[in-house]
């Protein structure tokens, strides 16, 4: 459960492409009206936030137009993230999934 929603389907390494562009999405979670785009990084850097928002998120509808009516959410799954980078991601609407021992902590984006 993320952003208060249950996701029913999980797909890994999904490739969307057109003649001019191609993108691989690490994890896509789906339910009937929402898609959660999750990029997986060992350690998150500030440029990863821009890549997720501008390139991966920005190209999503172009590459996978069948989901144009779905509400889109962005997330970063990581082992390590500095506090300043974490706050930037949250402020920009990205949910963080961070491993803490055997558990995954979910840090929701700022409302």
Report each predicted region and the residues it spans.
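Active-site metal-binding core of divalent-cation-utilizing nuclease and nuclease-like domains
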Residues: 5-32
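Short amphipathic alpha-helical surface micro-motifs
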Residues: 20, 55-59, 77-79
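Conserved catalytic cores of phosphodiester-cleaving nucleases, focusing on short active-site segments
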Residues: 25-48, 52-60
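Arginine/glycine-rich "motif VI" loop of SF2 helicases in the C-terminal RecA-like domain
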Residues: 58-69
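Domain-level recognition of nuclease-like catalytic cores that cleave nucleotide substrates
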Residues: 72-111
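Residue-level detector of flexible, active-site-proximal loop/helix-junction positions
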Residues: 16-17, 44, 81, 103
């Amino acid at each position: 459960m993320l952003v208060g929603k249950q996701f029913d389907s999980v797909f890994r390494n999904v490739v969307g492409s057109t003649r001019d562009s191609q993108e691989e999405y690490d994890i896509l979670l789906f339910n009937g009206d929402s898609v959660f785009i999750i990029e997986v990084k060992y350690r998150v850097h500030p440029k990863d936030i821009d890549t997720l928002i501008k390139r991966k998120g920005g190209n999503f509808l172009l590459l996978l137009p069948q989901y144009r009516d779905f509400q889109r959410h962005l997330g970063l799954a990581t082992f390590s993230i500095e506090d300043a980078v974490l706050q930037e991601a949250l402020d920009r609407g990205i949910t963080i999934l961070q491993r803490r021992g055997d558990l995954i902590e979910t840090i929701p984006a700022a409302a």
